[in-house]
Amino acid sequence: MPQKRWNDHLMSRRAVLRHGANGLLAGAALWALPSVAWGRQAWERLDETRAIVDGRTPTGRGITLDLPSVSEDGASVRLTVSVDSPMSSDDYVEAIHLYALGNPSPPIATFRLTPRAGKAEITTRVRLNESQTVVALAEMSDGSVRVAEQRPRVTVSGCLIREETYGNGSDDTLPEPRVRMPRRLAAGEPGEIITLLNHPMETGLREDADGETIPQRIIERFRAELDGETVIDAELARSLAADPYIRFYFRAEEEGELYLLWQEDSGATAESRQSVSPG
């Protein structure tokens, strides 16, 4: 090959390599952009979550969603969501919505809060049918929305048709809730409370030994009041684990009574009344 043609060939080859490398770098930079830049956040795939956002632009700041990165059994996976907020009368979290996008029924729960909560943090246990994305949306009193997403891996499915996924609650009555009050409660400071109810949380998605569908039977509502004022009002759904468990906070200024109500979709209820004595 003549020298000039050889030089032209080398220059063309170098240009191709250079442009190719630049293209790869540009592609890598695009893939490194957060999902919001692509409009591919998981919450956008579900009608219910899009309806909550309702045209607003969610932010990922000020909200944390915590689940184990790997769960050996998806039948009962611990989940904690917390939102940065003073929980004052003019600046508080109005609602926290939880969804498991890979479940046959994605809604987990909606927790509606008031400033009486004192701290916007909820812990519960959920069923995860498979490795999937879990979404938390927080609606704030100023009209803004915050979003957090996690993708836990499940090694054994919490499939909602597995018998061992369900608890052993009575068929006709609700047991007395178990409640753990804070050991020490300072006036005006958030106090942690944990409550649990033994209940199968039947989803209506599995069959009995005769092949008949077992009717849905779930706890659909939880409510906590302090001296008649709402602390938290929760709508619970089929993706909540059996024997539902809720950890939350309340703030008391003086002695009073904390009232807890669990309500089944049959209308049956279980109640607990706890004395509150801030130190």
Please annotate each region the language model reported.
Residues 1-15, 22, 26-30:
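N-terminal secretory signal peptides
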Residues 31-62:
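C-terminal segment of N-terminal export signals and the immediately downstream linker at the start
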Residues 52-72, 170-186:
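N-terminal edge beta-strand
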Residues 83-87, 197-213:
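Short amphipathic, basic-aromatic surface patches that mediate peripheral association
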Residues 116-122, 239-247:
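Aromatic sugar-binding surface patches on proteins
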Residues 129-133, 253-257:
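Extracellular Ig-like/FN3 beta-sandwich strand-entry sites
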Residues 141-147, 264-272:
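Short acidic/polar inter-strand loop motif in beta-rich domains
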Residues 151-157, 275-279:
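Short beta-strand edge segments in extracellular beta-sheet folds
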